[in-house]
């Protein structure tokens, strides 16, 4: 996770608003010495941010759950690790020119990128009876994400307010799970990474990023069925990623120059997943796999894989519920 965070912050340091497969209009207004840095960073930022968004928001809202809990007195908590099969740009081999923009073939390294998380859900209303099931049940749902302070030889990452961020949302039961009926629900959740500042050096540039934020909103239509020792769940939904940052940058060579800018991106992606769980008394061990796809990202530079490539992700964890 540190690798993708570090990469995304480095890339954001040069970034400007995204253009569509042509030179970035906002970069065109810059000096010749900063045009190439602007174009490359815009593309790199746009390439990495969807992966970071998926590592935060991908998959089920509560690991292995597709039904409401059954009203007051019921709760669930799950500790999980999310991982996405991603591609990280190779910054060490990337050169920024000073003679105007130049389209490059940017190398990437394939690797799994992970983020730990804690999900929680609290029953609020058990719903209205309908035959052998109930409808209209309501749960409060949420998640907790934590970003530690990081200090290495070439990067210092400082999260604001202790680095802990709580996301909140709600789940509404369309059908409550019973002996014969699967549980079906709709949920909506807002999840953010903690606001972060970064100071770093990369290649021929030094930079400082302040007020970096990544906000996600997502909805899920999910179903769940327990069969003795086993549980099965599946879901479909959409994620929206919104990122912003303020940056200052000093290019040290071949022509020393400084500039400042704001950077931001918004993207919507479709997600679908399935999970399998093993019931062990009060604890459930759950494994989940899914795929995220869609969204539009245009780049001036070339990558081995498209920035909006469909990507596999997975989660594994333990859930306790009553």
Regions found by a protein language model. Give the residues of each.
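Transmembrane beta-strands of outer-membrane beta-barrel pores
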Residues: 81-85, 124, 144-150, 174, ...
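Detector for outer-membrane/organellar transmembrane beta-barrel domains
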Residues: 179-268, 273
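Membrane-embedded beta-strand positions of outer-membrane beta-barrel proteins
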Residues: 75-79, 120, 140-144, 170, ...
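Outer-membrane beta-barrel translocator domains and adjoining extracellular loop/strand segments
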Residues: 89-94, 147-159, 195-205, 243-253, ...
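Transmembrane beta-barrel domains of Gram-negative outer membranes and organellar outer membranes
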Residues: 21-163, 175
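Repeated loop/turn-to-beta-strand initiation elements of outer-membrane beta-barrel proteins
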Residues: 127-130, 138, 177-181, 229-232, ...
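Outer-membrane beta-barrel "beta-signal"
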Residues: 276, 309-322
